[in-house]
């Protein structure tokens, strides 16, 4: 298991992801974005899952990026733009 940090473009993404994770019984927590990572709406979700499964929780247009901690720092695994409306 590994812990991943999800950043979002807005709080709507946080709420939608939280609801999906709760419904699936996943282990996660919502918190403020760490100071050394700025961006998005100010909230993030920490998700614990096996490597490779984190991608299924990305919500297009809402998820900004996914990070994990590596060698004492942050590693960006993926970055997503905002979908046009």
Question: Where do the PLM segments sit?
Answer:
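C-terminal structural segments of small proteins and small subunits
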Residues: 51-85
């Amino acid at each position: 298991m590994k812990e991943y940090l999800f950043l979002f473009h807005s709080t709507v993404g946080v709420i939608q992801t939280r609801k999906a994770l709760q419904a699936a019984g996943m282990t996660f927590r919502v918190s403020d974005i760490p100071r050394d990572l700025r961006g998005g709406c100010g909230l993030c979700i920490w998700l614990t899952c096996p490597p490779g499964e984190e991608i299924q929780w990305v919500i297009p247009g809402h998820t900004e990026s996914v990070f994990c901690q590596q060698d004492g720092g942050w590693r960006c695994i993926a970055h997503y733009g905002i979908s046009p409306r």
